[in-house]
Swiss-Prot record:
GO biological process, one term: proteolysis
Record-level Gene Ontology MF annotations: aminopeptidase activity; metal ion binding; metallopeptidase activity
Keywords for the protein's UniProt record, in alphabetical order: Aminopeptidase, Hydrolase, Manganese, Metal-binding, Metalloprotease, Protease
Keyword Aminoacyl-tRNA synthetase: no
Residues the entry annotates as binding Mn(2+) 1: D224, H290, E319, E333
Record-linked SUPFAM superfamilies: Creatinase/aminopeptidase, Creatinase/prolidase N-terminal domain
Binding site for Mn(2+) 2: D213, D224, E333
EC number: 3.4.11.9
Chemical reaction(s) catalysed: Release of any N-terminal amino acid, including proline, that is linked to proline, even from a dipeptide or tripeptide
Highest rank taxon of the organism: Bacteria
Cofactor annotation remark: Binds 2 manganese ions per subunit.
Descriptive protein name: Putative Xaa-Pro aminopeptidase
Cofactor(s) this protein requires: Mn(2+)
């Protein structure tokens, strides 16, 4: 823990140096947990050149003092004036704040602390996962795999989307997950044409393709997997069978392409080019993927607009899809650990339709 904390502080100190800033104020639950390893629903971290201060209220104070590395000075939070006094004491003239977690109250608080502040994308600091984070993600993917194996056999004609979604939720917890990382998506038949369909009372029929997008949380870290399963042995729509094969091809190409030599946009293009060269060119309507970690969607993105190189040990999804209005849809989503040349396919053992 101590070594990882020092590595994380090195990331933050470089951010301070690059932005010519004196301190970073962290108010989000995710980044507070990322730095300290201590889960809490409130608190303020001030990372400055001398040390790290955590201001946390009475619900967590005693536990935090015991659990958190001594490099972090834990203080009982009673008033915002404590944070302001610290900033004045260490000479904070330029403050970095988390733009992606910015609330109205947070912004008003910032104005009182420091006249000059810079909004940063705080998720960027978590792009490169450390060994303990990778272990947690591997574990949460394994929990998800266990449920997916059962799910493929479980889905039967006559079941509703809602029933299947609730079953997934229950099974993820039984398998060791803390809770859903997001509400499961279950879409059968024509409902599959809506990428973020909300499960309904529509019943599955034999020959349907059923898209199931689900994940859970382990030690704070999320999984995000999609499988489109065939119910029965023969599809009732040959167009969707062709679409499945094309999505599968694009998905595998993206998994094989992901590495530190490519940008998120370039990996997106690998998948997108395969679908756009087919009869389904008009039906891939979202980005290829995104980062996964303490947030279900975080940096880096695998999209047409993400022109940064993927960094080693980033965890991303590869999730191309085809969505044909009034017909149905196919999506296959996997999680990948980015490496220099050959990335690690984390979800390789999660079953597919064929």
């Amino acid at each position: 823990m101590h070594n990882e904390l020092q590595q994380k502080l090195a990331v933050l100190h470089k951010l301070l140096q690059d932005n010519k800033a004196d301190a970073i104020l962290i108010g989000s639950d995710q980044n507070r947990f990322w730095l300290t390893g201590f889960p809490s629903s409130a608190g303020w971290l001030v990372v400055h050149k001398q040390r790290v201060n955590l201001f946390i209220d009475g619900r967590y104070f005693e536990a935090a003092k015991t659990a958190i590395d001594p490099l972090v000075k834990v203080e009982l939070f009673t008033t915002y004036k404590q944070v302001k006094a610290l900033c004045e004491q260490v000479g904070v003239k330029h403050l970095l704040i988390e733009g992606d977690y910015l609330t109205f109250n947070y912004q008003n608080f910032i104005k009182e602390l420091c006249a000059q502040y810079t909004v940063i994308n705080a998720q960027e600091i978590r792009r490169q996962k450390l060994p303990s984070e990778i272990l947690a993600i591997e574990k949460v993917v394994e929990i998800t795999r266990k449920v997916a194996v059962k799910l493929k056999r479980f889905i039967q004609p006559g079941m509703t989307e809602l029933f299947i979604a609730q079953w997934i939720t229950d099974q993820l917890v039984k398998a060791g997950g803390a809770k859903n990382s997001f509400d499961p998506i279950v879409a059968t038949g024509k409902n599959g044409a809506n990428p973020h369909h909300k499960p309904s009372k529509l019943k599955v029929k034999s020959g349907d393709f059923v898209t199931c997008d689900f994940g859970t949380i382990y030690n704070g870290y999320c999984s995000d997997i999609t499988r489109t399963f065939l119910v029965g042995k023969k599809p009732n729509n040959e167009v969707l069978l062709k679409a499945y094969k094309k999505v599968d091809e694009a998905n595998m190409a993206g998994i094989n392409a992901a590495n530190t030599q490519l940008t998120g946009a370039e990996v997106d293009k690998v998948c997108r080019d395969i679908i756009e060269a087919s009869e389904f060119k008009d039906y891939f309507v979202h980005s290829t993927g995104h980062g996964v970690g303490l947030d279900i969607h975080e940096m880096p993105n695998v999209s047409t607009s993400y022109n940064k190189l993927l960094c080693e040990n980033a965890v991303i999804t590869i999730e191309p899809g085809i969505y044909i209005p009034s017909v149905g849809g196919i999506r296959i989503e996997d999680m990948v650990l980015v490496k220099d040349h050959k990335s690690v396919w984390l979800s390789a053992k999660i079953p597919r339709a064929f």
